[in-house]
Amino acid sequence: AGRYAYSPDCVAPSAVKSPISPFVPLALDDEGINKQIDDFVSCAQLAKSAGYDGIEIMGSEGYFINQFLVEHTNKREDTWGGSYENRMRLPITIVEKIRSALGENFLLIFRLLLEELLL
């Protein structure tokens, strides 16, 4: 859940504390971001192997993916932050890798928040 996680080991795009958790998240490095992407793919593969026809990827409500999209929680100055194109890199990469791993017939729904009200 990114910075919303109630754990001293929480991670996020940047070290921006959530108002609902006492812990400041660790800003992920490239290796950590790629592990998170791989974990999304692994979870999608588990859903498919369990017989699901598809999954919904939660890119909204202030959770992990959404934290990369929003300037308030993404203070990065690398390929994962800054411009809107860079901030969209994480969700696009997750979707592309899931699609590549599971094929065109596995249903993917991506929930995207259109207005950021959660800080």
Model-predicted segments: where are they?
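Flavin-dependent oxidoreductase catalytic cores
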Residues: A1-L119
